[in-house]
UniProtKB/Swiss-Prot annotation:
One of its GO terms (cellular component) is cytoplasm. It comes from Thioalkalivibrio sulfidiphilus (strain HL-EbGR7). IMP binds at D14, E15, G16, K17, N39, A40, G41, H42, T130, R144, Q225, T240, R304. One of its GO terms (biological process) is 'de novo' AMP biosynthetic process. The gene is purA. This is Adenylosuccinate synthetase.
C-alpha cells in the first residue's frame, strides 16, 4: 500500500524543502503543491547543476513523476509560462506531466500593483512581502471576488468579472495609494492569450488523488514557506497569506486528512528568517555573518540576505505539534562544521517569566529572549557524509539532543546541496 506524505518547512521557510522533495520523489508517483504561489523558491542541485523552481512542483525533474498544482495555490499565468519555458529549454517535458486545478485563484497584474503600493505606503513598517501579488490574490479569494483559472476558459465571463474587480482595485490604487490605474484591455488580452496553452493542463486534482490512493501509489505534498509563516499559526502579521501547515495540504488539494500517512518537518541545523518579524535567536555579530556566509543565505526568490541565528527548539516544538510531524529532516548540518561551541535555544525569557512554548502574536514574541544550552561543536567535515556512523561524535550528540527536546525522531540529515548528500534513517514512503 502506498503512502501520502507531506513535506513542509518547520521554521520561517528556506529550510531546504526542494532538495528533500526531489530526493524522495524517486519513490513517488506524484507531487502536489497545495499553497502559496511563485513567492516560493525551491532550489535543487542535481549532479552539480542548480535549478530554482518557484511554482512548479520539485518532482518535475524526476522522469515519470506527475506534478499537480492544487486549488490552494494562487497561480500567476505569466510566471507559470515563464517557468515552463525555462524548463522546456533544458529538455524537461513539462506539459506531459504538469496538471492544474481549475479552482486555483489567478494572480493578475493589479495584484502586483497593489502589493507594491502597500509595501511602499507602510514604509519602515513594511512586512517584507516578495511583491508578487500573493497577498492581494488571497484577499480576493476570501472576499469572493477573485478570478479562478477555470474562468479564463470562458471569454465573456472572464471579461465581465475582470471589469468588476478591476474597477474596485483601480479605485483603491488611484484614490488611496495615488498610483497609476491598471489597464483593463491589456490585462484581458494578456490573460486570454494564455488560455489555449493552459486549458489542456487542467485536471480534477481531488479525483486524481483518489485514483492514486486506490492504486496504492506514493504521493508527496510539497509545502512552501514554513510553519512560522502560517497565516493563522505564524508570527502574525509578519506571515504569508496561506496555511503553510499540514492541514493546508488537505484544504489546498482536496485530499482527506485521514489519507495523510506521514509528515516530514524540514529544519535547518540553525535558524534563518527573511524579511521583518520577531526572531529570538537572531545573531547580530560575527557568528551571524559566518552562518550567512557558510550557508549561502540569500533568498532564491528575492535575493535578499537572510537573517541568521542559533537553533530554536522552542519554535520547532510548536511546529511539531501544529503539524503532527512524524519525523524531522535536519538540513545544512555541514554549515556548523568547525565551530568550537553551539547554542541551542531551549526556552524563552519574557520579562520575569520563562516559557517553553512561543507566545501568541508578534508583539509578545518580539519581547522574548532566548535561554540557551551550550553544546560542543566539531572540527571534522560532515559535507557529503551519507552514513550516520560516519558523522562526528559531537554532531551526533547535537542531533540527539534536538531529537530529545523536540520529541520526534530525526529521520533524515542533509549534509550538502546535492540530492545524494543525504543520510536517510527512515524513509517517509517505507
Amino acid at each position: 500500500m502506498g503512502k501520502f506524505a507531506v513535506v513542509l518547512g518547520s521554521q520561517w521557510g528556506d529550510e531546504g524543502k526542494g532538495k528533500v522533495v526531489d530526493l524522495l520523489t524517486e519513490n513517488a508517483a506524484a507531487v502536489v503543491r497545495f499553497q502559496g504561489g511563485h513567492n516560493a523558491g525551491h532550489t535543487l542541485v542535481i549532479d552539480g547543476k542548480k535549478t530554482v523552481l518557484h511554482l512548479i512542483p520539485s518532482g518535475i525533474l524526476r522522469e515519470g513523476v506527475e506534478c499537480m498544482i492544487g486549488n490552494g495555490v494562487v497561480l500567476s499565468p505569466e510566471a507559470l509560462m515563464k517557468e515552463m519555458a525555462q524548463l522546456e529549454a533544458e529538455g524537461v517535458p513539462v506539459r506531459d506531466r504538469l496538471r492544474l486545478s481549475e479552482s486555483c485563484q489567478l494572480i493578475l497584474p493589479y495584484h502586483v500593483s497593489l502589493d507594491l503600493a502597500r509595501e511602499q505606503a507602510r514604509g519602515k513598517a513594511a512586512i517584507g512581502t516578495t511583491g508578487r501579488g500573493i497577498g492581494p490574490a488571497y484577499e480576493d479569494k476570501v472576499s469572493r471576488r477573485g478570478l479562478r483559472l477555470g474562468d479564463l476558459f470562458h471569454r465573456e465571463r472572464f471579461a465581465a468579472k475582470l471589469g468588476e474587480v478591476l474597477d474596485y482595485h483601480n479605485f483603491v490604487l488611484q484614490h488611496y495609494f495615488k498610483s497609476e490605474a491598471v489597464d483593463f484591455q491589456q490585462v484581458l488580452d494578456q490573460s486570454l492569450a494564455l488560455a489555449e496553452t493552459l486549458q489542456p493542463l487542467v485536471m480534477d486534482v481531488p479525483e486524481r488523488l483518489r485514483e492514486l490512493r486506490a492504486q496504492g501509489a506514493n504521493v508527496m505534498f510539497e509545502g512552501a514557506q514554513g510553519t512560522l509563516l502560517d497565516i493563522d499559526h505564524g508570527t502574525y502579521p509578519f506571515v504569508t497569506s496561506s496555511n503553510t501547515t499540514a492541514g493546508g495540504a488537505c484544504t489546498g488539494s482536496g485530499v482527506g486528512p485521514l489519507d495523510l500517512d506521514y509528515v516530514l518537518g524540514i529544519t535547518k541545523a540553525y535558524t534563518t528568517r527573511v524579511g521583518a518579524g520577531p526572531f529570538p535567536t537572531e545573531l547580530f555579530d560575527a557568528m551571524g555573518e559566518h552562518l550567512a556566509r557558510r550557508g549561502h543565505e540569500f533568498g532564491s526568490t528575492t535575493g535578499r540576505a537572510r537573517r541568521c541565528g542559533w537553533f530554536d527548539a522552542v519554535a520547532l516544538r510548536r511546529a511539531v505539534a501544529i503539524n503532527s510531524i512524524s519525523g524531522l529532516c535536519v538540513t545544512k548540518l555541514d554549515v556548523l562544521d568547525g565551530l568550537e561551541t553551539l547554542q541551542l535555544c531551549v526556552g524563552y525569557r519574557c520579562g520575569d517569566a520563562e516559557f517553553s512554548v512561543p507566545p501568541a502574536g508578534a508583539d509578545a514574541f518580539a519581547t522574548c529572549e532566548p535561554i540557551y544550552e551550550e553544546m560542543p561543536g566539531w572540527q571534522e567535515s560532515t559535507l557529503g557524509v551519507t552514513r550516520r556512523e560516519d558523522l562526528p561524535v559531537n554532531a551526533l550528540r547535537y542531533l540527539e539532543r534536538i531529537q530529545e527536546i523536540i520529541g520526534v525522531p530525526v529521520d533524515m540529515i542533509s549534509t550538502g546541496p546535492d540530492r545524494d548528500q543525504t543520510i536517510v534513517l527512515r524513509h517517509p514512503f517505507e
